């Protein structure tokens, strides 16, 4: 944020979080319980939705075929990455690239809208002044879904601030 600017600052990347900066101090309203219980609108959450959509046969057939071609979807391979390897949240987030690539397809559009709405209501709207200050974002999910994010924020009369892919970009 510009120096001493009051703002809500959010992360939408592999994981997600949100805080309020009063110009001097960062305030956290929602205590994160980690990627399994929290992380609305994160790469790991989108990866989880895509895998479930695929395995529960909710994903459109053509999209499912392409998903199979791009990823190893063998159950044993997936379970190994989720339960035996470190950072299962990062593994799940690798599927977010597919979602971003297909963000204009109805199946992915619905997932994106649902998760963004959840993030806005569960995180951003916790702060009473969420309509008065800009909301800045950092992370690849926010960066690559900036247009969708802006539409969702506008729906709730929330002002989108800066959107950066990585902290170093600022």
For every predicted segment, state its role:
Residues 2-8, 51-170:
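ATP-binding/phosphotransfer module of carbohydrate and carboxylate kinases, centering on a glycine-rich
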Residues 1-65:
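Phosphate-binding/catalytic loop of phosphoryl-transfer enzymes
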